[in-house]
């Protein structure tokens, strides 16, 4: 009320995506909508995880089911997919204020959207069709060379992840590690800014490779933050600031949080290790599910989760 905006954009805080909100707003205005909801196609087997919209040929929303357990409304002409809510809403301010002052309704999918369907113009925004991220990215040519090219519709234009559980969080981190990642942090036109830790550059030590191959500090297909010191091998992983991977240690497909020390000869695979863990030498994590479950949380996908300060002292 203080700023008197004509529209209000409502977002969720646990989703990862790149979205040109100006395209979203233009679509909303073209439809003369009171509310526009960004939706994406997902398989019907996932419908129970989302709010699901029923639409007509013009993408006007006719019905809305909140996490249907059976018989979800499918995409017209495609019975194997549904249109799932991304938790991104654009409201005319008048419409939003009308809802907020009319009663105790609080949940968008259960209360607010169904309440508005019969009296307001509510439209679906087909995210993967309409969202376009234009950016310079490196592409691999047929001869193997890498070239910087302006792409009018990058691959991550269609990317969206809800990281509300540990498996999804791990998946989202792994999406960053590829040579051509599913979600690109390095675009020139769409850079992602974050808090920078006051730490020195990452350091990779022991340059003379030994017969066992593991004394050399190196990270492959990985993201390594400032302050890290690596003298083991890191593959397909994300290292947060000030992490240390000691000699002969191996870290694969893992997310290592701030100030974690991975001791010598450790073997870690498919793990999320929270802050300030000092992992003793020769510790093995992620290779024996039954043993891991005795000590740690193991997700449905088999990701081992080590809580903060579980390992407190280096032996």
Segments from the language model and where they lie:
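Glycine-rich phosphate-binding loop signature in dinucleotide/nucleotide-binding domains
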Residues: 2-5
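A secondary-structure boundary/capping signal
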Residues: 11-12, 92
């Amino acid at each position: 009320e203080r700023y008197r905006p004509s529209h209000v954009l409502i977002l969720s805080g646990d989703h990862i995506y790149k979205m040109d909100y100006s395209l979203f707003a233009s679509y909303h205005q073209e439809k003369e909508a009171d509310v526009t909801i960004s939706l994406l196609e997902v398989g019907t087997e996932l419908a129970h995880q989302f709010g699901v919209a029923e639409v007509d040929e013009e993408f006007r929303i006719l019905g809305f089911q909140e996490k249907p357990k059976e018989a979800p409304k499918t995409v017209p002409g495609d019975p194997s997919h549904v249109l799932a809510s991304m938790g991104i809403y654009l409201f005319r301010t008048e419409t939003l204020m009308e809802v907020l002052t009319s009663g105790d309704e609080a949940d968008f999918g259960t209360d607010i959207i169904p309440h508005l369907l019969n009296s307001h113009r509510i439209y679906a925004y087909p995210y993967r069709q309409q969202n376009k991220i234009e950016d310079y990215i490196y592409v691999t040519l047929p001869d193997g060379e890498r070239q910087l090219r302006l792409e009018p519709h990058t691959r991550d234009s269609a990317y969206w992840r809800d990281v509300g559980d540990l498996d999804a969080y791990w998946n989202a981190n792994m999406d960053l590690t590829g040579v051509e990642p599913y979600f690109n942090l390095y675009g020139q036109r769409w850079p992602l800014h974050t808090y920078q830790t006051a730490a020195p550059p990452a350091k990779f030590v022991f340059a003379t490779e030994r017969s066992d191959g593991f004394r050399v500090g190196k990270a492959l297909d990985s993201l390594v933050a400032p302050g890290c010191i690596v003298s083991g091998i890191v593959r397909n992983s994300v290292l947060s600031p000030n992490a240390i991977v000691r000699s002969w240690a191996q870290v694969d497909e893992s997310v290592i949080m701030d100030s974690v020390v991975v001791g010598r000869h450790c073997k870690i695979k498919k793990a999320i290790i929270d802050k300030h863990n000092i992992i003793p030498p020769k510790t093995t994590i992620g290779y024996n599910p039954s043993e891991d479950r005795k000590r740690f949380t193991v997700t449905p996908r088999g990701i081992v989760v080590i809580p903060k300060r579980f390992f407190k002292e280096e032996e």
